[in-house]
Amino acid sequence: MQSLSLGQTSISKGLNYLTIMAPGNLWHMRNNFLFGSRCWMTRFSAENIFKSVSFRLFGVKCHNTDSEPLKNEDLLKNLLTMGVDIDMARKRQPGVFHRMITNEQDLKMFLLSKGASKEVIASIISRYPRAITRTPENLSKRWDLWRKIVTSDLEIVNILERSPESFFRSNNNLNLENNIKFLYSVGLTRKCLCRLLTNAPRTFSNSLDLNKQMVEFLQAAGLSLGHNDPADFVRKIIFKNPFILIQSTKRVKANIEFLRSTFNLNSEELLVLICGPGAEILDLSNDYARRSYANIKEKLFSLGCTEEEVQKFVLSYPDVIFLAEKKFNDKIDCLMEENISISQIIENPRVLDSSISTLKSRIKELVNAGCNLSTLNITLLSWSKKRYEAKLKKLSRFA
């Protein structure tokens, strides 16, 4: 009897597996009744091995020969036919490919019936492959619930194209339905819920209790600051900052205190700030907000600004706190290198909305048009492209 020359064969009694190791492949076959509780090594002939064991080869590889084999050949074929990026899908949610039952064809037909193109469907599955695990009944129910917020099927398709996770992350339709009812009950409008669904869909995957906790916290915060209509306060905060319901009450409370203490605001001033431009700061990491403000303060102090000027600058444009320290410093330096004074920046903080490359190119164009940057209203540096180019054309005409 000749020994198996391609590799070695081991019989594992404890795991009930027969493993055949050859140069290019690793095959696993289960034998549930032949072996005991420990394992030993022995030699078999190739003839005996393949006579005694019947098996189905189910490992299929795609593109990358070093990656883990896919388990479901039919699934792989279906997804490839649909134009799905298999490598992307496997990297994002590899567990989906180990399922023996999936609903990719049902998902395809469902989304086609709602107006999605084949390309959009392929993109959705590539980026969020767990979508193919949802049943037709679950999809239909969830879609109907979304239509209580979103006005058309096409609008839902557009949301799914941007963020497939928003629709497919959870299959708990009862929780979704309860959250929708609750958010309507506290006075949020359909427009506000649509904004939540588009920007912060995880709000609807939260447990109902979690959303109730945040709403109750905000109502109490509004009352403590002197707002006489807690429901109106909640509506304003959520509309200004749709991400707030997916943050902890601890974080929001810390940021309210940060704004109060840092800028020495009384209740009325704080109320105006957080119902307006300061609302967006409430969901920031409190440590990040403090570090960012400390950096802004240090940079502006180094350029001769007073404490009052720094506070005026940040309060007039709270979004500046979102800028990373290096990005903020680099933008300030870029503007000052072009003979724009710090007082001009303080008066027109929204110029920091633009990227450094946009600032440099626009400054160059304005100089070429004969503009004196030291006397120019620099707000046009942050205008939309269309509006800026129209203004530049007028300035060039009079140069």
From Swiss-Prot:
Residues 169-170, 247-251, 324-331, 355-358, 384-391 are annotated as: Interaction with DNA. GO terms for cellular component: mitochondrial matrix; mitochondrial nucleoid; mitochondrion. One of its GO terms (biological process) is termination of mitochondrial transcription. Changing R169A: Strongly reduces affinity for DNA. Strongly reduces transcription termination. It comes from the Eukaryota. Keywords: DNA-binding, Mitochondrion, Phosphoprotein, Repeat, Transcription, Transcription regulation, Transcription termination, Transit peptide. Residues 1-57 form a transit peptide. SMART domains: Mterf (SM00733). Contains nine structural repeats of about 35 residues, where each repeat contains three helices. The repeats form a left-handed superhelical assembly with a solenoid structure that wraps itself around DNA. PANTHER family: TRANSCRIPTION TERMINATION FACTOR 1, MITOCHONDRIAL, TRANSCRIPTION TERMINATION FACTOR, MITOCHONDRIAL. Transcription termination factor. Binds to a 28 bp region within the tRNA(Leu(uur)) gene at a position immediately adjacent to and downstream of the 16S rRNA gene; this region comprises a tridecamer sequence critical for directing accurate termination. Binds DNA along the major grove and promotes DNA bending and partial unwinding. Promotes base flipping. Transcription termination activity appears to be polarized with highest specificity for transcripts initiated on the light strand. This is Transcription termination factor 1, mitochondrial. It comes from Homo sapiens.
